[in-house]
């Protein structure tokens, strides 16, 4: 029945979205509370994020921290010692035992002459604090062994691009083919920070003669960053907190005691010159001015939480290297 003489319009179908399409990730939301935290997050490629300038800053700071922080130095050195140990040993499994012993002896002699274990430890330390290590396979005529192959270590700062030779397939000194395989390395003749620098003079080393060691954290990443990068601010906090505790304890220890009085101002207490100092000697008998008392300063340092702070921050530092706390701290007293 038409009450107003018009045909009613058909109802429009309401679009019903699946429930999963209405979901959102909380971490993808930018609010006034988290905007500052995520302000440094950028959408860059692996090589752009770790370009030559960024890696130079990270290497410089990591080296500085390792040189001046005993915990950082110990962690890096322990990592290298535990990884390499006394060096690799060759075990031959041929049927001829005499040949096995001969080859094993020659390998051990060659490894000793080129200081293989020491160089491997240096490579592991460089990978941790510099992010990467380079080693050139070259013939050393001064070796007295039957095999004259030697390993020449190259610092990461020397493998870089000459501005005149940079192209699309070169990533800061490393040239790749269309499949991403390294073809050659551009190595400066001297360290750019050395006193005998040759400027941009460089040599080209073929990929088959170069060993490049680094940890690839992202696809299409071709250069390494220090493995302790995420821990560098924590190392700084550890040193600053330690210095603050020591400074507070020293400041409190500068005062053997303080004179005070309970008498009101202009009261019956003897007049004492403000900010006056008295030298105290051991086993001395001290008399106080009338109405005055002596009290020692409560230093409140070191704080009781100092040990807990060091434990937690060292544990956090060691996580970026997958190292247990007792190894990083060099202390297993709490494990027994």
Identify the meaning behind each predicted range:
Residues 29-36, 57-67, 180, 196, ...:
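Short, mixed-charge, low-aromatic patches
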Residues 1-31, 200-240:
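N-terminal start-of-domain structural block
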Residues 63-216:
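Structured, mid-chain assembly/scaffold modules that mediate subunit interfaces
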Residues 25, 29, 33, 37, ...:
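Amphipathic, alpha-helical segments enriched in basic
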Residues 2-15, 104-147, 219-225, 247-269, ...:
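Short N-terminal signal/transit or membrane-insertion segments
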Residues 1-87:
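N-terminal-proximal low-complexity accessory segments that begin disordered
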Residues 21, 50, 54, 58, ...:
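Generic structural signal of hydrophobic/aromatic residues within well-ordered alpha-helices
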């Amino acid at each position: 029945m038409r009450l107003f003489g018009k045909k009613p319009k058909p109802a429009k179908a309401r679009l019903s979205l699946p429930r999963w399409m209405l979901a959102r990730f909380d971490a993808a939301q930018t609010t006034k509370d988290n905007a500052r935290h995520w302000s440094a997050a950028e959408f860059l490629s692996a090589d752009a994020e770790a370009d030559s300038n960024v890696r130079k800053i990270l290497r410089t700071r990591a080296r500085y921290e390792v040189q001046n922080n005993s915990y950082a130095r110990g962690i890096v050195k322990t990592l290298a010692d535990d990884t390499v140990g006394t060096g690799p040993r060759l075990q031959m499994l041929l049927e001829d035992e005499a040949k096995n012993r001969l080859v094993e002896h020659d390998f051990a002699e060659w490894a000793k002459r080129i200081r293989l274990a020491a160089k491997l430890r240096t490579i592991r330390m460089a990978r941790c604090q510099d992010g990467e290590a380079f080693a050139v396979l070259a013939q050393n005529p001064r070796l007295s062994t039957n095999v004259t192959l030697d390993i020449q270590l190259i610092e990461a700062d020397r493998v870089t691009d000459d501005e005149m030779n940079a192209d699309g397939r070169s990533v800061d000194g490393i040239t790749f083919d269309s499949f991403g395989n390294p073809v050659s390395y551009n190595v400066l003749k001297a360290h750019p920070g050395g006193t005998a620098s040759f400027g941009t003079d460089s040599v080209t080393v073929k990929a088959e003669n170069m060993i490049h060691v680094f940890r690839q954290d992202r696809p299409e990443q071709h250069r390494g960053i220090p493995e302790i990068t995420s821990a560098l601010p924590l190392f700084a906090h550890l040193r600053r907190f330690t210095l603050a505790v020591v400074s507070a304890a020293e400041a409190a220890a500068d005062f053997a005691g303080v004179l005070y009085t309970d008498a009101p101002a202009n009261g019956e207490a003897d007049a004492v010159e403000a900010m006056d100092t008295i030298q105290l000697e051991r086993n001395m008998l001290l008399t106080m001015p009338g109405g005055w008392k002596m009290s020692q300063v409560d230093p409140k340092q070191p704080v009781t939480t100092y040990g807990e702070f060091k434990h937690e921050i060292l544990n956090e530092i060691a996580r970026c290297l997958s190292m247990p706390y007792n190894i990083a701290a060099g202390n297993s007293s709490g494990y027994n």
